[in-house]
């Protein structure tokens, strides 16, 4: 049964560079352009095509031992090699000498860091996966999404355990690079394909001063060795002071760079993320339906999106459920703060409606509801979300599956 077929019942009621903080580093980190950079060599300007050819020739004549990256031979002369070389050229405005220098340093770093084998290592940060930095799903354009959230480090014990000394810090840096390497492996590296990731950074409870050293090292590593790999940076739960800092830096950023920053104030994470990412790919803590264990069951089941206006109640009716069938559903409203309930209404007129979930006031921090119900007779399930006490419009999503009874008489 297709969830999208269910009807809705709407009821209105300068040169010297100062020491950068984590925030300023995030703002000034360069990103590429999803729409413009398709990597078709035929679409490059003649001067850019010439720069690409010169870089190939200089790299071939270079003394650099390593000439492959992410499993792609840079001297192979194929489309994948061109995509990677163009990333380094764009990072240095197509200046061949600067691009070659950057590329050679990156190749040396990858060899010393053993980056090619990094994704297979167990670095002992299982408890941070899915919390601090992790790849989860794709955006609506097919870009892998990397989530970052450093709020857990506001607790001194956690901070000391991860960043307590230089050895611990270096191990964390290696793990953070590992997360990005896993994201890079999800890219196509071909003209017209998906050649960059989306980065979502949650600024809630982020300890700014304490993370300065670690964050600056991470961002330096990424900027030096992963050029043009981040297409869009989405900042969620943005505190007021971040917006002030951004407004100060904004005049010095190019329009192209500014177009790739998305700022979302506290409480608007779901509303912002729904514009770029499908709800089944958004983590439950941000108003989506994705849980860490979902990937074990294959691709996520698509969800249907809807919105609830302020002063409105919405009833989602899932009809055509046979007797003895089991219906399982997920439903979420971004920043809930409203009342939710569920009931089953039999088709037979003499039967009574069954309360499946009593009306419950959902808190703003509540995650998606997942529940199931086995019917005795045919009927429909009604999921109700009551936003009549709020003036704020909210985004929401739901999905369901119906499993028919296998019992035979």
UniProtKB/Swiss-Prot annotation:
<dbReference type="InterPro" id="IPR036273">
    <property type="entry name" value="CRAL/TRIO_N_dom_sf"/>
</dbReference>
<keyword id="KW-0813">Transport</keyword>
<dbReference type="InterPro" id="IPR011074">
    <property type="entry name" value="CRAL/TRIO_N_dom"/>
</dbReference>
<protein>
    <recommendedName>
        <fullName>Patellin-6</fullName>
    </recommendedName>
</protein>
<feature type="domain" description="CRAL-TRIO">
    <location>
        <begin position="116"/>
        <end position="294"/>
    </location>
</feature>
<dbReference type="Pfam" id="PF03765">
    <property type="entry name" value="CRAL_TRIO_N"/>
</dbReference>
<dbReference type="GO" id="GO:1901703">
    <property type="term" value="P:protein localization involved in auxin polar transport"/>
</dbReference>
<keyword id="KW-0131">Cell cycle</keyword>
<comment type="function">
    <text>Carrier protein that may be involved in membrane-trafficking events associated with cell-plate formation during cytokinesis. Binds to some hydrophobic molecules such as phosphoinositides and promotes their transfer between the different cellular sites.</text>
</comment>
<keyword id="KW-0446">Lipid-binding</keyword>
<dbReference type="Pfam" id="PF25099">
    <property type="entry name" value="GOLD_PATL1_C"/>
</dbReference>
<dbReference type="InterPro" id="IPR044834">
    <property type="entry name" value="PATL"/>
</dbReference>
<dbReference type="GO" id="GO:0071365">
    <property type="term" value="P:cellular response to auxin stimulus"/>
</dbReference>
<keyword id="KW-0963">Cytoplasm</keyword>
<dbReference type="InterPro" id="IPR036865">
    <property type="entry name" value="CRAL-TRIO_dom_sf"/>
</dbReference>
<keyword id="KW-0132">Cell division</keyword>
<dbReference type="GO" id="GO:0005886">
    <property type="term" value="C:plasma membrane"/>
</dbReference>
<feature type="domain" description="GOLD">
    <location>
        <begin position="270"/>
        <end position="404"/>
    </location>
</feature>
<comment type="similarity">
    <text>Belongs to the patellin family.</text>
</comment>
<dbReference type="InterPro" id="IPR056794">
    <property type="entry name" value="PATL1-6_C_GOLD"/>
</dbReference>
<dbReference type="InterPro" id="IPR036598">
    <property type="entry name" value="GOLD_dom_sf"/>
</dbReference>
<dbReference type="InterPro" id="IPR009038">
    <property type="entry name" value="GOLD_dom"/>
</dbReference>
<dbReference type="GO" id="GO:0051301">
    <property type="term" value="P:cell division"/>
</dbReference>
<dbReference type="Pfam" id="PF00650">
    <property type="entry name" value="CRAL_TRIO"/>
</dbReference>
<keyword id="KW-0175">Coiled coil</keyword>
<keyword id="KW-0472">Membrane</keyword>
<dbReference type="GO" id="GO:0005737">
    <property type="term" value="C:cytoplasm"/>
</dbReference>
<dbReference type="InterPro" id="IPR001251">
    <property type="entry name" value="CRAL-TRIO_dom"/>
</dbReference>
<dbReference type="GO" id="GO:0008289">
    <property type="term" value="F:lipid binding"/>
</dbReference>
